[in-house]
């Protein structure tokens, strides 16, 4: 009851929500036949404050919230070493994409100039940072993100993943919030592996090549995808969630092995004459050749012209040098060395990898041609026995890794606390 009479006959007012009397709270605010106390108001404010960030994240990005290209590149620099040209291209493309969405929301449908979407194609060797760039962008912009492997996709009706499964995974990653999903980022890896197998498309049925490209084309250019609610399987009588993919940013990536030969052959044909500057194939690195890429090269490689046209922004990533790999080991916010130092620190042990050890790790990754992706397995292999035995050992203060540990698989040097004190 909002009000009651006390023993002395005075009218005592009560909070309609928590039931406390006017004597138990600081303030009681009256409304039409209801009362609310200051404590309930504070509780309501806390609830609203907790929900606002989630609403804002799902809502429209304001211009002030959107970092400019130079800020995007600076943030990418903290996680991705090198690849400056690719980072600049990506920063501009992502900024323009979300600026376009803001423009569409502000101007409405009556705007004369319609801004088209610019999806992105990343070309670079294995372990050069393609996936990490896309992941970092999505995390930075606080938008839903999903990675899809193009090699697992098949045409509808065949065994394998349907292309619409990509959108279903995107929805799952944002708790089935349709508005958020429609502004997300999709990264399709190994796009080069679904290239057309022959110049004549009518030779055989290519269920994991050109057919998948055609299916992806619809998603990339914008379509209404039908997705079962909460991850259910499709069946005829089911209600589907309709997702418009028009404003989803698609980033496709691949190593495109052999594309450099296609580009080199074209450039050799065009570079004939007295004024042509000729460089031998041995003098040109793969990254140098990739920088001369034209859409016709991708078509010759086996990507259908329609899909090439829907990926107008092309960013090429170079092969990582030994110095770049050493930087990747030590410099980024989540650098591999920092991660292992933290793991050893949990056992009260300091981990030191000497410069010679870092160089040996980088050289091994270069020999394996695995790029930055192969660094973890090399470090893991070198430290496996130590990590197995260390928790049961007493008195170890420091583990030191040098080039012998990496090259010859010898045990790292263990420094005990007594030795550390004596040397100090």
UniProtKB/Swiss-Prot annotation:
Per UniProt, residues of the ClpX-type ZB domain are 3-56
Superkingdom, taxonomy of origin: Bacteria
Where does the chain bind Zn(2+)?
A: 15, 18, 37, 40
Taxonomy, top ranks, is:
Bacteria, Pseudomonadati, Pseudomonadota, Betaproteobacteria, Burkholderiales
GO BP terms: namely: cell division; proteolysis involved in protein catabolic process
- GO CC terms of this entry: HslUV protease complex
- What this protein is called in its record is ATP-dependent Clp protease ATP-binding subunit ClpX
Q: How is the subunit organization of this protein annotated in UniProt?
A: Component of the ClpX-ClpP complex. Forms a hexameric ring that, in the presence of ATP, binds to fourteen ClpP subunits assembled into a disk-like structure with a central cavity, resembling the structure of eukaryotic proteasomes.
Q: Does the keyword Membrane apply?
A: no
NCBIfam families hit by this protein? clpX, PRK05342.1
Task: Please describe what this protein does.
Answer: ATP-dependent specificity component of the Clp protease. It directs the protease to specific substrates. Can perform chaperone functions in the absence of ClpP.
Q: Which residues of the sequence carry a binding annotation for ATP?
A: 125-132
Report any Pfam family annotated for this entry: ClpB_D2-small
Q: Name one GO molecular function term.
A: ATP hydrolysis activity
**Gene3D superfamilies according to UniProt:** 1.10.8.60, ClpX chaperone, C4-type zinc finger domain (6.20.220.10), P-loop containing nucleotide triphosphate hydrolases (3.40.50.300)
Supply the InterPro entries for this chain. AAA+_ATPase, ATP-dep_Clp_protease_ClpX, ATPase_AAA_core, Clp_ATPase_C, Clp_protease_ATP-bd_su_ClpX, ClpX_bact, P-loop_NTPase, Znf_CppX_C4
Which keywords does the record carry? ATP-binding, Chaperone, Metal-binding, Nucleotide-binding, Zinc
Describe the family membership recorded for this protein in Swiss-Prot or TrEMBL: Belongs to the ClpX chaperone family.
């Amino acid at each position: 009851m909002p009000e009651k009479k006390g023993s002395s006959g005075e009218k005592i007012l009560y909070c309609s929500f928590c039931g406390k009397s006017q004597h138990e709270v600081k303030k009681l605010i009256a409304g039409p036949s209801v009362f609310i106390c200051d404590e309930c108001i504070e509780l309501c404010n806390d609830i609203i404050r907790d929900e606002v960030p989630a609403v804002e994240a799902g809502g429209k990005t304001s211009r002030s919230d959107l970092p400019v290209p130079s800020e995007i590149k600076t943030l990418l620099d903290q996680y991705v070493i090198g690849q400056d040209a690719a980072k600049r291209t990506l920063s501009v493309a992502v900024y323009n994409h979300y600026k376009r969405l803001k423009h569409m929301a502000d101007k409405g449908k009556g705007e004369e100039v319609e801004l088209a979407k610019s999806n992105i194609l990343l070309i670079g060797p294995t372990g050069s940072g393609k996936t990490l760039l896309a992941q970092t962008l999505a995390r930075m912009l606080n938008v839903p993100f999903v990675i899809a492997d193009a090699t697992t996709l098949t045409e509808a009706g065949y065994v394998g993943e349907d292309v619409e499964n990509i959108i279903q995974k995107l929805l799952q990653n944002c708790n089935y919030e349709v508005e958020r999903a429609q502004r997300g980022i999709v990264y399709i890896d190994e796009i080069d592996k679904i290239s057309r197998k022959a110049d004549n498309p009518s030779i055989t049925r290519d269920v994991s090549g050109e057919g998948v490209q055609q299916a992806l084309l619809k998603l990339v250019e914008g379509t209404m995808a039908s997705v079962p609610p909460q991850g259910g399987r499709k069946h005829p009588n089911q209600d589907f969630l309709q997702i418009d993919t028009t404003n989803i940013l698609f980033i496709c990536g691949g190593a495109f092995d052999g594309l450099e030969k296609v580009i080199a052959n074209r450039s050799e044909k065009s570079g004939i004459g007295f004024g042509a500057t000729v460089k031998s194939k041995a003098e040109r690195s793969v990254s140098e050749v990739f920088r001369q890429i034209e859409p016709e090269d991708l078509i010759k490689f086996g990507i259908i012209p329609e899909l090439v046209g829907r990926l107008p922004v092309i960013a090429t990533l170079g092969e990582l040098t030994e110095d770049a790999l050493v930087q990747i080991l030590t410099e980024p916010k989540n650098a591999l060395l920092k991660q292992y130092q933290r793991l050893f620190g949990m056992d009260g042990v300091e981990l030191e990898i000497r410069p010679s050890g870092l160089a040996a790790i980088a050289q091994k990754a270069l020999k394996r041609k695995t790029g930055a992706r192969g660094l973890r397995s090399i470090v893991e292999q070198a430290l496996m026995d130590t990590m197995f035995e260390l928790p049961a050992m007493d008195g170890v203060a420091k583990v030191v890794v040098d080039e012998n540990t990496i090259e010859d698989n010898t045990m790292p040097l263990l420094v005990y606390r007594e030795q550390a004190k004596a040397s100090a």
